[in-house]
UniProtKB/Swiss-Prot annotation:
Domain of life: Eukaryota
Gene Ontology biological process terms, A to Z: fatty acid metabolic process
Subcellular location per the Swiss-Prot or TrEMBL entry: Endoplasmic reticulum; Golgi apparatus
Family recorded in the similarity comment: Belongs to the ACBP family.
Domain ACB: 1-86
General function of this protein: Binds medium- and long-chain acyl-CoA esters with very high affinity and may function as an intracellular carrier of acyl-CoA esters.
Gene designation per UniProt: DBI
InterPro entries referenced in this protein's UniProt entry, alphabetically: Acyl-CoA-binding_prot_CS (IPR022408), Acyl-CoA-binding_protein (IPR000582), Acyl-CoA-binding_sf (IPR035984), FERM/acyl-CoA-bd_prot_sf (IPR014352)
Keywords: Endoplasmic reticulum, Golgi apparatus, Lipid-binding, Transport
GO CC term, one of those recorded: endoplasmic reticulum
Pfam families: ACBP
Species name: Gallus gallus
The protein's name in its UniProt record: Acyl-CoA-binding protein
Length: 86
């Protein structure tokens, strides 16, 4: 639900320790897919490694519905809460 999604978006900022880069990419990409939909920007340039990684993670979800992305995002944040605590 939208409320669960918004709550998860707040809770992910309150984790006691920093998730791995890959975990954060998963969370970021599902957030973007849930809020924006399919990638709507050009892939960042060669030297923007972080930007490219984020874009690629988001682009990998192309075609996923916003609702499915929202559910997956909430599930991923729940998983991180269990692992890192809030």
């Amino acid at each position: 639900s939208e409320a669960a999604f918004q709550k998860a978006a707040e809770e992910v900022k309150e984790l006691k320790s920093q998730p791995t880069d890959q975990e954060m990419l998963d969370v970021y990409s599902h957030y973007k897919q849930a809020t924006v939909g399919d990638v709507n920007t050009d892939r960042p340039g060669m030297l923007d490694f972080k930007g490219k990684a984020k874009w690629d993670a988001w682009n990998a979800l192309k075609g996923m519905s916003k609702e499915d992305a929202m559910k997956a995002y909430v599930a991923k944040v729940e998983e991180l809460k269990g692992k890192y605590g809030i």
